[in-house]
């Protein structure tokens, strides 16, 4: 799996969410709405999710192993650090 494109939209509002990211995998598959969150231990990514009928949030798409999650987080956070704020 190769991440062939990362698009970052930084958020300049108050709160813990810092950006919304879209990634392209192998120039063939796009995942939208990955969030960059500021946590107590630093930045991390949250995969796109949906609120279920019981009020819990469930990931729509996510890596199935730690190695892939770590790789994805590293790539997304590196792109986040390089991105500039865009005024809306």
UniProtKB/Swiss-Prot annotation:
UniProt similarity note: Belongs to the SpoVG family.
Source organism, top-level taxon: Bacteria
Keyword Repressor applies: no
Primary role: Could be involved in septation.
Record-given protein name: Putative septation protein SpoVG
Keyword Cell division appears in the UniProt entry: yes
Family matches, as InterPro entries: SpoVG (IPR007170), SpoVG_sf (IPR036751)
GO biological process terms, semicolon-separated: division septum assembly; sporulation resulting in formation of a cellular spore
Lineage: Bacteria, Bacillati, Bacillota, Clostridia, Lachnospirales
């Amino acid at each position: 799996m190769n991440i062939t494109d990362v698009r970052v939209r930084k958020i300049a509002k108050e709160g813990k969410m810092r950006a919304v990211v879209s990634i392209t995998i192998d120039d063939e598959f796009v995942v939208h709405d990955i969030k960059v969150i500021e946590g107590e231990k630093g930045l991390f990514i949250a995969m796109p999710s949906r609120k279920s009928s019981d009020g819990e949030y469930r990931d729509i798409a996510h890596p199935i192993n730690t190695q892939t999650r770590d790789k994805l987080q590293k790539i997304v956070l590196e792109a986040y650090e390089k991105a500039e704020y865009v005024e809306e």
